[in-house]
Amino acid sequence: MTIKVGMISLGCSKNQVDAERLLAMLAGDGFTICNDMTECDAVIVNTCGFIEDAKKESIDTILECCAAKGEGSLKCVAVTGCLAERYREELAREIPEADVVLGIGSNGKIGEAIRKAVMGEHFTEYGEKESLSMEGERMLANEPWFAYVKVAEGCDNRCSYCAIPLIRGRFRSRPMENVIEECKELAARGVTELNLVAQDTTRYGEDIYGESRLPELINAVCEIEGVHWVRILYCYPDRVTDKLIDTIARQPKAVHYFDIPVQHASAHVLRDMNRRGDRRSITALCQKIREKIPDVVLRTTLIAGFPTESEEDFAELCKLVEEVRFDRLGCFAYSQEEDTPAAELEQIPEEVRRRRAEIIMELQMSAAFDFADRCTGRTLEVLAEGWEDGQYYGRSYMDAPDIDTRVYFTSEDEIEPGSYVPVLITDTDGYDLIGMAKAKEDTK
């Protein structure tokens, strides 16, 4: 009997890469991958365990899938990913309806586990977290023209609020030749946009080569035939060097986009977070990047309501947002994570944390709308992705998959999804851009 398996992957792009490797393992092991959950014999919930809201979403999804057992053909619910790794025995004990619970170091056992569970056995295993393989085939879980490429696993930064080192282990890079080979394989399959990811992408290579090799990796990936865009996500501010900035400025395929989660602006809050820097150093870095790459897009992530954040510290954070005017920004209310140093501190009330995060996003709205308005009149290369409400939509170099905005446009010519189209921006709709594709004769 062929077992049909579905996948629900939650959380970040790094977790999605793990899910894609799980799917490829199963397909290679004789399983049928099924997108219709009502027809699946088994479903995998690849969980996120990063912050409280993500944990709740993961648990709710597991419970929903468990409740669906008996409806249709579903016999097995398997739980993988960060929540399964972090809570191990607690998860198996508290949700006994889950038939399989695998820590990230046991992902290679997924086929064996599902076969046993479909026959009525429970399967629980937690291998060494640092044995999680970053190599192997992948079955892309998104559109076929872009992919995330995980260049490293784990993290050594030890930010005081973050549980990722507890879940994913120490930082460890992939050999450069392995990353390049994967990028070549993806390009051969028609992937034209490669998004390089890690917990700290700027640290890539330090553990293997004694120094960051991210600029060299970017140069090598940009040489691959068929690759059109190379994007770097998750840059640690202290490790954004002149060499990295100059590489992205010089390489035509490296998109002018920096994702730099700075987290805060107050020197003492950053110190309490076990991070470095202050508002001045962050502002200076952003100014330097903009001077070297005038059309660059700067994205950041902030945390509001960290335990030691005073009203003055929060005002400093607001000032950073107003001064730098990031082009893209996300702000999280601080989440108290078990077994982290920050969790032991006296906490700010949750309603205050959430309100502060809302204030940051309200401040950012002005900068984001101004940025969109400044795009009017520009011609942007847009990666067409689909059709909606009578118009095409896609992303420009300014938009990372899943997290940023869209460009909506009309066209006299038929547009194939996955193609790159020059689009004249004529208007805005909130954060999104509106435009018109240039006719083919206009682009000759």
Where are these regions (language model features)?
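Short acidic/polar active-site loop segments enriched in Thr and Asp
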Residues: 192, 228, 327, 332, ...
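Conserved beta-strand core positions
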Residues: 5, 42-43, 147, 194, ...
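Conserved, mostly hydrophobic/aromatic
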Residues: 179, 196, 232, 260, ...
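Terminal RNA-binding accessory module
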Residues: 336, 344-444
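Conserved SAM/AdoMet-binding glycine-rich loop
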Residues: 77-81, 86, 188-312, 322
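Proteins enriched for Cys/Gly/acidic motifs involved in redox and nucleic-acid/cofactor modification
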Residues: 1-204, 243, 254, 258, ...
